[in-house]
Amino acid sequence: MASLLGAYPWTEGLECPALEAELSDGLSPPAVPRPSGDKSSESRIRRPMNAFMVWAKDERKRLAVQNPDLHNAELSKMLGKSWKALTLSQKRPYVDEAERLRLQHMQDYPNYKYRPRRKKQGKRLCKRVDPGFLLSSLSRDQNTLPEKNGIGRGEKEDRGEYSPGATLPGLHSCYREGAAAAPGSVDTYPYGLPTPPEMSPLDALEPEQTFFSSSCQEEHGHPHHLPHLPGPPYSPEFTPSPLHCSHPLGSLALGQSPGVSMMSSVSGCPPSPAYYSHATYHPLHPNLQAHLGQLSPPPEHPGFDTLDQLSQVELLGDMDRNEFDQYLNTPGHPDSAAGVGTLTGHVPLSQGTPTGPTETSLISVLADATATYYNSYSVS
């Protein structure tokens, strides 16, 4: 390459001064610049070549002849490396030629302005989609691609606002079906989903809360389901039923509350005890506290472990033992019935005397069973 440049140096004598003199004398018409208003003609005007383009114009042809199997991109890479390898002295003639072409271009096209071609932008795959449209499309089909913004806005204008029912379909139906399938469970609302505005967090606890019966016999019939209830089964339809309680110590579960004492449960049968589970509870109705007092959480074991906290003197201090002896000696009420009531925790009503004075009432049976249990508990 250096030998070629040395043999054919670029000199100013190659600029054809005779031709320039003819053009300056006006013997031949000069090049008429194209009108600026013609956009089609202006779009065809090429930029003046720089020094690299002047050098690569002939060098590319030479490399293409030597390497016919190479792609044009590969040839461009080779030309770039070769141009960087040249020294400043070797690049000088090409730089001068590029400057001459630039000045000539300015004379030919004085109103020329470089306007780069706009690259054809492909359609963007990921467009910004309305968030509400994405939420509403979840209920239709999760496999379909999101539509354009215009369609999403059109649907939003047609529907007005995005209702939570359309965004989260079937939440209430899922809750109802779950509650119907598992009546012993209250927390059937699906986790991980936001609560709809029209649905309060406490509304999930109100339905199906009348699953406890007013009679204690249904509670005794299903003892293995009740301890697993997670929520507070208080019922708004709280009605006292004083003569259905057959459990001798059923009312003692409320003995820990400050409003209801232990002895009051023995002296009189309270209303039917509302069962509350062994998990933490949240009272929903404040009017129940007026009847039951402020309830404390129940003990861990459903047995009689709470009796360990009370001494025998506190339990029997206010009782008349002669009254219990009178009831124990009553005919028709054998000791076997008391023993069975002590072991099972139930005293059948049929074993008590059906007729007689007030000592045959349910209060007497409860007091009799309580005293018998305390005596056997102290002996053991």
From Swiss-Prot:
Tissue specificity comment: Predominantly expressed in ovary, lung and heart. In the ovary, restricted to oocytes (at protein level). Present both in mesenchymal and epithelial cells in some adult tissues, including ear.
GO cellular component: cytoplasm; nucleus
Primary site of residence: nucleus
Region (Required for beta-catenin-binding): 323-328
Residue runs in coiled coils: none
Molecular function GO labels: DNA-binding transcription factor activity; DNA-binding transcription factor activity, RNA polymerase II-specific; sequence-specific DNA binding; transcription cis-regulatory region binding
Compartments, as annotated in UniProt: Nucleus; Cytoplasm
InterPro entries: HMG_box_dom, HMG_box_dom_sf, Sox7/17/18_central, Sox_C, SRY-related_HMG-box_TF-like
Annotated segments matching region Disordered: 24-43, 139-167
SUPFAM superfamilies from the UniProt entry: HMG-box (SSF47095)
A Pfam family hit: HMG_box
Protein induction: Up-regulated by VEGFA.
This protein's UniProt keywords: Activator, Cytoplasm, DNA-binding, Nucleus, Transcription, Transcription regulation
Chain residues forming the annotated DNA-binding region: 45-113
Matches recorded under PROSITE patterns: HMG_BOX_2, SOX_C
Record's subunit section: Interacts with CTNNB1/beta-catenin; this interaction may lead to the proteasomal degradation of active CTNNB1 and thus inhibition of Wnt/beta-catenin-stimulated transcription.
Role played: Binds to and activates the CDH5 promoter, hence plays a role in the transcriptional regulation of genes expressed in the hemogenic endothelium and blocks further differentiation into blood precursors. May be required for the survival of both hematopoietic and endothelial precursors during specification. May play a role in skeletal myogenesis and up-regulate the expression of muscle markers, such as PAX3/PAX7 and Meox1. Competes with GATA4 for binding and activation of the FGF3 promoter. Represses Wnt/beta-catenin-stimulated transcription.
Name recorded for this polypeptide: Transcription factor SOX-7
Organism per entry: Mus musculus (Mouse)
Lineage: Eukaryota, Metazoa, Chordata, Craniata, Vertebrata
Gene: Sox7
